[in-house]
């Protein structure tokens, strides 16, 4: 257990510091990484690592000790069932502090504290976006390829028209407009 700091505490009183660190730990376990001041990140690191070590034990007493600090039961569940098993063969060093630039406004030194191995739910968000782009490009290629390589129709269907939807659009026009809407949405997000 780290020795308590002497002198001024974060937030004024020891009770306020304890509550602030508990809230920071809750946010860290919930989101995988948080941005805060360097001082708060340095003070949070030992607490977060102790809580992960207790969660690795997995027994009821450890769960109750963690619940005494982290009041959100959903976050405790995530800590015990998702975060702790990832660190089963790691002895400490569960967090990383990366210094960022000074904060605009008061020039306080800022840092990002994050769990060393990314959370599983943070990864698919980026993959969905790239997968959507690839799918849109693939659809665009498929839409262009049949028009170039399609053999001329033979037989009595030469006078047949393209299928028309209820709104009066052809399916090709509808596909082009859907692609344009998706591209516009992606540009607005970026």
Swiss-Prot record:
InterPro entries assigned: Ribosomal_bL17 (IPR000456), Ribosomal_bL17_CS (IPR047859), Ribosomal_bL17_sf (IPR036373)
GO MF annotation list: structural constituent of ribosome
Alphabetical list of SUPFAM superfamilies matching this protein: Prokaryotic ribosomal protein L17
Record's keyword terms, sorted: Ribonucleoprotein, Ribosomal protein
Taxonomy, superkingdom: Bacteria
Spans through the membrane: none
Region (Disordered): 127-190
RNA-binding keyword on record: no
Biased composition (Acidic residues): 179-190
Gene3D superfamilies on file: Ribosomal protein L17
Compositional bias per record (Low complexity), positions renumbered to this chain: 143-153
GO CC, any one term: cytosolic large ribosomal subunit
Any one GO biological process: translation
Ribosomal protein recorded as keyword: yes
Disulfide bonds: none
Family assignment from sequence similarity: Belongs to the bacterial ribosomal protein bL17 family.
Listed HAMAP family: Ribosomal_bL17
Classification via PANTHER family: LARGE RIBOSOMAL SUBUNIT PROTEIN BL17M (PTHR14413:SF16), RIBOSOMAL PROTEIN L17 (PTHR14413)
Subunit organization: Part of the 50S ribosomal subunit. Contacts protein L32.
Protein name as catalogued: Large ribosomal subunit protein bL17
Record organism: Salinispora arenicola (strain CNS-205)
């Amino acid at each position: 257990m780290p020795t308590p700091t002497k002198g001024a505490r974060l937030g004024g009183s020891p009770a306020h510091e304890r509550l602030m660190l508990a809230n920071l730990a809750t946010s860290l376990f919930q989101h995988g990484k948080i941005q805060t001041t360097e001082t708060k990140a340095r003070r949070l690191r030992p607490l977060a690592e102790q809580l992960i070590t207790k969660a690795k034990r997995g027994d009821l007493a450890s769960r109750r000790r963690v619940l005494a600090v982290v009041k959100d039961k959903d976050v405790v569940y995530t800590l015990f069932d998702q975060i702790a098993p990832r660190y089963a063969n790691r002895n400490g060093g569960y967090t990383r502090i990366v210094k960022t630039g000074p904060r605009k406004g008061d020039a306080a030194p800022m840092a990002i504290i994050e769990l060393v191995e990314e959370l599983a739910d943070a990864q698919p968000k980026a993959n969905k976006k790239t997968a959507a782009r690839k799918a849109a490009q693939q659809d665009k290629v498929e839409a262009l390829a049949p028009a170039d390589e399609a053999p001329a129709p033979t037989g009595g269907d030469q006078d047949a028209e393209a299928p028309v939807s209820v709104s009066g659009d052809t399916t090709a026009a509808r596909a082009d407009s859907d692609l344009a809407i998706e591209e516009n949405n992606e540009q607005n997000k970026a």
